[in-house]
Amino acid sequence: MAGYVVVGTQWGDEGKGKIIDVLSEKADYVVRFQGGNNAGHTVVVDGEKFILQLLPSGVLQAGTCVIGPGVVIDPKVFLDEIDRIEKRGAKTDHVIISDRAHVIMPYHIEMDKIRESVEDRIKIGTTKKGIGPCYADKISRDGIRMSDLLDLKQFEEKLRYNLKEKNEIFTKIYGLEPLDFDTIFEEYKGYAEKIKHRIVDTIPMVNKALDENKLVLFEGAQAMMLDINYGTYPYVTSSSPTLGGVTTGAGISPRKIDKGIGVMKAYTTRVGEGPFVTEIKGEFGDKIRGIGGEYGAVTGRPRRCGWLDLVVGRYATEINGLTDIVMTKIDVLSGLGKLKICTAYEIDGVIHEYVPADTKSLDRAIPIYEELDGWDEDITQIKKYEDLPVNCRKYLERVQEILGCPISVVSVGPDRSQNIHIREI
């Protein structure tokens, strides 16, 4: 069997979409295992950019694309995305949805907006797309699943029950107008009609493929430091984008995972609120943002930029049991002069080589840096590792040494062809 998992090792936006697109050329299945439409991933094919939110990055390849049980789905967003890429010539008949995946409802989106606007509440920087409230209903056993859309009587009962409770909250606590049952029911009845042919039990299908030694690629959204358990809580997402999340989010045994592939940007970025120890503020941070095009694929929000944080990198490598690292955007560092990598934090006089659980302590953390010589050459057209500038290779080798995990692929540009394969994945 060949189960490959691709995860982000930082705070997202590492370039997972591009790498998954490349790897999926040989994949029989590409399986999305968590998250929703709260993150965009970008795939560039022959200079043409595709921005995806719900669909797996492998949708532009021939393998079956699975939206797994651990994903939460806004049917409107799903259908809009299908329509958008079909209009650009892509086929989508190979896209299927797990009948166990949960459905984002209008009251989830409304609740998300309310919670983010409450004055005394910590501002997480949510995308306000209903992801968190949908997962909350899932955990409290009040969720509506894709299988419910195949049984309209059951869907009607669950919607009526949930809407009564949610409208009590909207009207009595927040003084808002109630949401209308008939409007929502008819809207989602229409969605059900359009997507019912895609809703299947994906678990036996994916496991059978693995048992037959087919290549199955598991794709996570967001990244390690946004994980609900191991990220910079509470500035995290509502699911587990780690390798461990694959087993519950796709319905497979951990014994069926052969490779853990961590995607790591050559510097660090973060969107929204939360601690960021290696953040570079001011003109130099703006320069990196400009060169790297560090703006949200969907929201357009500027990303915070900083030096490569290998405290985070080590943490991600260990927890995910990574076998390979894909280093992206190394080309952005060309011409920046001296480069820094963070190897430890100093917090209240104590050296930390691991990410502490106390998020507030990270606000006091002082990064301990190693400084390396940079390079000035344009490396975007280089195809062989040995052709990279000496200092670029030294940078990569030092990162690899600190992580204790091989860098197998280096990305030197946004197009799927701009990769240097050091060792086969």
Curated annotation (Swiss-Prot):
Binding site for GTP: 12-18, 40-42, 303, 329-331, 411-413
Keyword Nucleotide-binding among UniProt keywords: yes
Native organism: Fusobacterium nucleatum subsp. nucleatum (strain ATCC 25586 / DSM 15643 / BCRC 10681 / CIP 101130 / JCM 8532 / KCTC 2640 / LMG 13131 / VPI 4355)
Biological-process GO terms, alphabetical: 'de novo' AMP biosynthetic process; IMP metabolic process
One protein family per Pfam: Adenylsucc_synt
Gene label: purA
Protein name (record): Adenylosuccinate synthetase
Principal EC category: ligase
Quaternary organization: Homodimer.
